[in-house]
């Protein structure tokens, strides 16, 4: 444990020392960032918290990049010794997980090594990293971008990162985006801006299956359309994938397809957005045997709001790429200042509704089960909903600045959560109501107190929860006490005893460096970002996070 604390301290000092070295090698510059997350574990049988043999776990990275005119080189050293609980155990180890060379000018941009890339909305190709989820599916290969006035083209050949190795699949892709206004002179000055895009991605993987004849080359293509005029915008993308028998679809030979559409309007004091999506057998990976986080090539986002409040985010929706239909609507309206309803500074009303459901599936014939291995799987009517509801979330939030010192917001949320679909275990679905009050009091310059009161009411799962947080901020320093209480549940699928989860956290920020320490209990739960989720086990102990940039 002492060695790990010294290691974190050493890297912190190294980063602070490098900040003075921003001009090197003939006018080039060095920039980077560093983060270390350490957690000490104590056994707590009351909440199901285990003690790990190492007593302490550390996740850390140091990322550096050197730039000189059109040249750039970078690397990221990573350490998981061992990974913090909740991260995949295959992350255990340390080394350079990311490195690249890059050259760019006005027309050409060439990268060799690791890179992240996204075509369109990402339905058929998206490489990205979420450090707090333990997710990284970066590409390792060559990428070339060519830019003209009206047209930009991207091509790549690469493999995907799979923890400390590379996945078995070879990825080839090309994407093009055309600005119609720049391409056609007659509409060059039009207030209506139109963009068109096309993408194609192919995965090659050797077929070694002794039973089925699996396609070695699997292609997917997508087209997109975007229109902007004033405060109005419309976006739509459609994608299709040829038959791709894989571990996530039970090795069926059905083709996949997906569509996403968004329409929005905004002006002063008013904003509205409506999003729709449908995906059918569209889980696309660079390895046909991969499941979970592994080798994800395409990305189908969850059509739901990503909540920041703890209890509102208790039951997050996990995107179902192989079959879902969903929508999300958001309306934001600000009542005028100096009116009876708006108050002195105006009042903001934020209303959001999201819904996700299964797609309709029909057997291909009387003798074949839906989704049977080695078959075409099923047929599906495009506009027909299935009989299984996955999720819904209705929430409304009112926010008002009372005066220069006080700011208040209240929120109500109603939620339905399908346990089998979202968490994979057979338990009653959750019907929940969440009520939140949030108060900020700025009593002196650079001094404020922030109080949150939250309550979650449900008869299912662990029963009712409540939480109070009191936070003090003073120019670079903050401290917070969080008291989360599970009221227990003796009417659910299992008996849950009441329990208190206290947590104290302190933090200090100096320029671009932030240090945060905490001690207490954390509940078992699910953490999601954009519909990508990981399970987090219960824990009791000390946490330390250091992050900095230079």
Cite the ranges covered by each PLM segment.
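Bacterial Sec-dependent N-terminal signal peptides
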Residues: 1-31, 550
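Short loop/turn motifs that connect adjacent beta-strands in outer-membrane beta-barrel proteins
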Residues: 21-30, 66-70, 103-107, 111, ...
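Short glycine/proline- and aromatic-enriched beta-strand/turn motifs that initiate or cap beta-hairpins
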Residues: 25-49, 354-356
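Exposed, low-structure sequence patches enriched in small/polar residues
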Residues: 35, 50, 57, 187-191, ...
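Long, low-hydrophobicity, solvent-exposed regions enriched in small/turn-prone and acidic residues
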Residues: 52-54, 58, 62-67, 74
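Outer membrane beta-barrel
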Residues: 65-160, 186-188, 268-289
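Hydrophobic, small-residue-rich alpha-helical packing segments that form membrane-like cores
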Residues: 135-184, 189-212, 216-221, 226
């Amino acid at each position: 444990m002492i060695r790990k604390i010294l290691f974190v301290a050493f890297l912190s000092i190294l980063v602070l020392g490098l900040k003075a070295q921003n001009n090197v090698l003939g006018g080039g510059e060095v920039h980077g960032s560093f983060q270390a997350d350490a957690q000490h574990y104590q056994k707590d049988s009351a909440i199901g918290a285990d003690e790990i043999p190492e007593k302490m776990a550390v996740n850390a990275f140091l990322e550096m990049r050197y730039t000189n005119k059109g040249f750039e080189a970078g690397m990221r050293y990573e350490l998981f010794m061992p990974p913090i609980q909740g991260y995949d155990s295959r992350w255990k180890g340390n080394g350079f997980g990311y490195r690249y060379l890059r050259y760019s000018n006005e027309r050409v941009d060439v990268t060799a090594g690791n890179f992240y890339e996204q075509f369109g909305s990402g339905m058929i190709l998206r490489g990205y990293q979420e450090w707090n989820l333990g997710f990284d599916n970066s590409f390792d290969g060559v990428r070339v971008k060519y830019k003209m006035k009206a047209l930009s083209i991207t091509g790549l050949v690469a493999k995907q990162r799979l923890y400390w190795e590379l996945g078995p699949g070879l990825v080839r892709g090309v994407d093009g985006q055309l600005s119609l206004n720049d391409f056609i002179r007659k509409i060059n000055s039009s207030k209506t801006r139109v963009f068109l895009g096309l993408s194609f991605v192919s995965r090659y993987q050797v077929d070694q299956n002794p039973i089925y004849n699996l396609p070695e080359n699997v292609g997917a293509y997508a087209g997109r359309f975007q229109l902007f005029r004033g405060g109005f915008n419309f976006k739509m993308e459609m994608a299709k994938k040829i038959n791709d028998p894989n571990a996530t679809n039970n090795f069926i030979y059905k083709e996949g397809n997906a569509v996403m559409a968004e329409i929005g309007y905004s002006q002063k004091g008013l904003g509205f957005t409506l999003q729709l999506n449908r995906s059918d057998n569209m889980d696309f990976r660079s390895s046909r045997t991969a499941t979970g986080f592994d080798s994800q090539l395409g990305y189908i986002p969850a059509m739901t709001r990503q909540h920041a409040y703890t209890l509102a985010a208790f039951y997050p929706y996990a995107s179902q790429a192989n079959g879902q239909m969903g929508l999300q609507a958001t309306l934001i309206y600000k009542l005028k200042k100096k009116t009876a309803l708006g108050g002195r500074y105006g009042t903001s009303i934020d209303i959001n509704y999201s819904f996700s459901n299964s797609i309709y599936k029909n057997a291909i014939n009387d003798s074949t089960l839906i989704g049977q291995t080695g078959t075409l799987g099923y047929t599906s009517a495009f506009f027909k909903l299935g009989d299984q509801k996955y999720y819904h979330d209705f929430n409304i939030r009112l926010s008002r600045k009372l005066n220069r010192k006080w700011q208040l917001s209240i929120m109500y949320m109603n939620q339905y959560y399908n346990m089998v679909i979202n968490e994979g275990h057979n338990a009653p679905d959750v019907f929940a109501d969440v009520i939140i009050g949030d108060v900020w009091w700025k009593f002196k310059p650079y001094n404020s107190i922030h109080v949150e009161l939250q309550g979650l009411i449900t008869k299912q799962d662990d029963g009712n929860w409540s939480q109070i947080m009191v936070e003090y901020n003073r120019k670079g320093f903050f401290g917070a006490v969080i008291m989360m209480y599970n009221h227990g549940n003796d009417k659910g699928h299992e008996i849950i005893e009441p329990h208190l989860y206290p947590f104290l956290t302190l933090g200090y920020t100096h320029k671009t460096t932030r240090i945060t320490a905490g001690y207490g209990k954390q509940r078992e739960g699910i953490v999601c970002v954009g519909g990508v989720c990981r399970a987090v086990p219960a824990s009791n102990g000390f946490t330390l996070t250091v992050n900095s940039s230079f």
